Amino acid sequence: MQLDKERAGVLVGSGMGGLTVFSDGVQALIEKGHRKITPFFIPYAITNMGSALLGIDLGFMGPNYSISTACATSNYCFYAAANHIRRGEADLMIAGGTEAAIIPIGLGGFVACRALSQRNDDPKTASRPWDKERDGFVMGEGAGVLVRLRSPFVFLRSLFNELFRFVREEKKRGNEFSI
Protein backbone atom coordinates (compact mmCIF):
# COMPACT_ATOMS: atom_id res chain seq x y z
CA MET A 1 0.00 0.00 0.00
CA GLN A 2 1.37 3.39 -0.99
CA LEU A 3 1.21 6.38 1.34
CA ASP A 4 -1.07 9.16 0.00
CA LYS A 5 1.05 12.20 0.85
CA GLU A 6 -1.93 14.52 0.37
CA ARG A 7 -3.47 12.82 3.41
CA ALA A 8 -0.31 12.91 5.54
CA GLY A 9 0.44 15.88 7.78
CA VAL A 10 2.84 17.27 10.32
CA LEU A 11 2.07 19.09 13.55
CA VAL A 12 5.27 19.88 15.46
CA GLY A 13 5.19 22.72 17.94
CA SER A 14 7.67 24.72 19.96
CA GLY A 15 7.19 26.90 22.99
CA MET A 16 9.80 29.43 21.91
CA GLY A 17 10.73 28.60 18.34
CA GLY A 18 14.14 29.30 16.88
CA LEU A 19 15.52 31.15 19.86
CA THR A 20 19.16 30.70 18.81
CA VAL A 21 18.45 32.06 15.31
CA PHE A 22 16.53 34.96 16.84
CA SER A 23 19.30 35.74 19.33
CA ASP A 24 21.97 35.56 16.60
CA GLY A 25 19.88 37.88 14.39
CA VAL A 26 19.51 40.48 17.12
CA GLN A 27 23.24 40.30 17.83
CA ALA A 28 24.05 40.77 14.12
CA LEU A 29 21.70 43.76 13.97
CA ILE A 30 23.26 45.43 17.00
CA GLU A 31 26.88 44.73 16.08
CA LYS A 32 26.86 45.01 12.27
CA GLY A 33 23.56 46.51 11.12
CA HIS A 34 20.51 45.11 9.34
CA ARG A 35 22.39 44.09 6.19
CA LYS A 36 24.24 41.39 8.16
CA ILE A 37 21.09 39.60 9.32
CA THR A 38 20.73 36.25 7.56
CA PRO A 39 17.84 36.02 5.08
CA PHE A 40 16.80 32.91 7.03
CA PHE A 41 16.27 34.97 10.20
CA ILE A 42 12.47 35.14 9.98
CA PRO A 43 11.80 31.72 8.41
CA TYR A 44 13.95 29.87 10.96
CA ALA A 45 12.92 31.93 13.99
CA ILE A 46 9.18 31.28 13.71
CA THR A 47 7.68 28.35 15.58
CA ASN A 48 6.17 26.57 12.58
CA MET A 49 9.52 25.76 10.96
CA GLY A 50 9.76 22.32 12.60
CA SER A 51 6.52 21.28 10.91
CA ALA A 52 7.29 23.11 7.69
CA LEU A 53 10.75 21.64 7.12
CA LEU A 54 9.68 18.12 8.04
CA GLY A 55 6.66 18.40 5.72
CA ILE A 56 8.83 19.74 2.88
CA ASP A 57 11.44 17.02 3.29
CA LEU A 58 8.89 14.21 3.49
CA GLY A 59 6.66 15.67 0.77
CA PHE A 60 3.60 15.57 3.05
CA MET A 61 0.82 17.79 1.72
CA GLY A 62 -1.82 17.30 4.42
CA PRO A 63 -2.38 19.52 7.47
CA ASN A 64 0.82 21.31 8.45
CA TYR A 65 1.11 23.90 11.17
CA SER A 66 2.46 24.36 14.66
CA ILE A 67 0.98 25.04 18.06
CA SER A 68 2.75 27.02 20.75
CA THR A 69 1.36 26.55 24.26
CA ALA A 70 4.50 26.69 26.40
CA CYS A 71 5.19 23.44 28.27
CA ALA A 72 1.96 21.83 27.01
CA THR A 73 2.83 22.28 23.33
CA SER A 74 3.42 18.61 22.45
CA ASN A 75 0.22 17.50 24.19
CA TYR A 76 -1.83 20.01 22.19
CA CYS A 77 -0.11 18.85 18.99
CA PHE A 78 -0.94 15.19 19.77
CA TYR A 79 -4.58 16.10 20.43
CA ALA A 80 -4.94 18.22 17.28
CA ALA A 81 -3.29 15.52 15.14
CA ALA A 82 -5.66 12.88 16.52
CA ASN A 83 -8.59 15.16 15.68
CA HIS A 84 -7.42 15.52 12.05
CA ILE A 85 -7.47 11.72 11.79
CA ARG A 86 -10.76 11.38 13.70
CA ARG A 87 -12.47 13.90 11.38
CA GLY A 88 -11.17 12.10 8.28
CA GLU A 89 -8.89 14.97 7.20
CA ALA A 90 -5.73 12.85 7.31
CA ASP A 91 -4.68 9.21 7.41
CA LEU A 92 -1.30 9.87 8.99
CA MET A 93 -0.03 12.66 11.24
CA ILE A 94 3.42 13.19 12.69
CA ALA A 95 2.94 15.18 15.90
CA GLY A 96 5.18 16.37 18.70
CA GLY A 97 7.36 19.17 19.91
CA THR A 98 10.85 20.56 20.03
CA GLU A 99 12.67 23.06 22.22
CA ALA A 100 16.24 24.34 22.46
CA ALA A 101 16.24 27.35 24.77
CA ILE A 102 19.39 26.72 26.81
CA ILE A 103 21.30 29.72 25.52
CA PRO A 104 22.11 32.93 27.41
CA ILE A 105 18.92 34.79 26.43
CA GLY A 106 16.72 31.77 27.18
CA LEU A 107 18.27 31.11 30.58
CA GLY A 108 18.36 34.83 31.34
CA GLY A 109 14.67 35.20 30.61
CA PHE A 110 13.68 32.36 32.92
CA VAL A 111 16.04 33.63 35.64
CA ALA A 112 14.53 37.11 35.33
CA CYS A 113 11.01 35.80 35.94
CA ARG A 114 12.28 33.55 38.76
CA ALA A 115 11.00 30.38 37.10
CA LEU A 116 14.08 28.17 37.61
CA SER A 117 14.74 25.99 40.64
CA GLN A 118 17.32 27.29 43.10
CA ARG A 119 18.28 23.79 44.29
CA ASN A 120 21.63 23.90 42.49
CA ASP A 121 23.38 22.19 45.42
CA ASP A 122 21.15 19.10 45.09
CA PRO A 123 20.30 18.54 41.41
CA LYS A 124 18.57 15.19 42.11
CA THR A 125 15.81 16.96 44.03
CA ALA A 126 15.64 20.15 41.96
CA SER A 127 12.88 18.98 39.64
CA ARG A 128 9.75 18.38 41.73
CA PRO A 129 6.75 19.82 39.87
CA TRP A 130 4.04 18.42 42.18
CA ASP A 131 5.79 18.97 45.50
CA LYS A 132 4.56 21.67 47.91
CA GLU A 133 8.21 22.66 48.41
CA ARG A 134 8.95 23.17 44.70
CA ASP A 135 10.76 26.36 43.80
CA GLY A 136 10.82 26.33 40.00
CA PHE A 137 11.66 24.03 37.14
CA VAL A 138 14.85 22.63 35.64
CA MET A 139 15.39 23.55 31.99
CA GLY A 140 15.97 20.91 29.38
CA GLU A 141 16.13 20.60 25.62
CA GLY A 142 14.87 17.99 23.26
CA ALA A 143 12.45 16.90 20.59
CA GLY A 144 10.06 14.05 20.12
CA VAL A 145 7.27 12.99 17.81
CA LEU A 146 4.60 10.33 17.62
CA VAL A 147 3.19 8.94 14.39
CA ARG A 148 -0.61 8.71 14.45
CA LEU A 149 -2.24 6.50 11.83
CA ARG A 150 -5.86 5.96 10.85
CA SER A 151 -5.05 2.30 10.30
CA PRO A 152 -1.89 1.34 12.19
CA PHE A 153 -0.52 -1.26 9.78
CA VAL A 154 -1.56 0.00 6.35
CA PHE A 155 1.12 2.68 5.98
CA LEU A 156 3.91 1.54 8.28
CA ARG A 157 6.23 0.06 5.67
CA SER A 158 5.94 3.09 3.37
CA LEU A 159 6.26 5.54 6.24
CA PHE A 160 9.34 3.96 7.78
CA ASN A 161 11.04 3.69 4.38
CA GLU A 162 10.35 7.40 3.86
CA LEU A 163 11.54 8.38 7.34
CA PHE A 164 14.74 6.34 7.06
CA ARG A 165 15.41 7.89 3.64
CA PHE A 166 14.92 11.32 5.22
CA VAL A 167 17.35 10.55 8.06
CA ARG A 168 19.97 9.17 5.66
CA GLU A 169 19.68 12.20 3.36
CA GLU A 170 19.83 14.72 6.23
CA LYS A 171 23.19 13.29 7.25
CA LYS A 172 24.46 14.25 3.79
CA ARG A 173 23.10 17.80 3.55
CA GLY A 174 21.36 20.65 5.33
CA ASN A 175 18.13 22.33 4.28
CA GLU A 176 19.80 24.68 1.85
CA PHE A 177 17.46 23.78 -1.02
CA SER A 178 14.10 24.08 0.76
CA ILE A 179 13.61 27.83 0.85
What are these regions (language model features)?
Residues 2-7, 15-154, 158, 162-165, ...:
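Acyl-thioester C-C bond-transforming condensing/cleaving domain
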Residues 167-175:
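Intrinsically disordered, glycine-rich low-complexity segments
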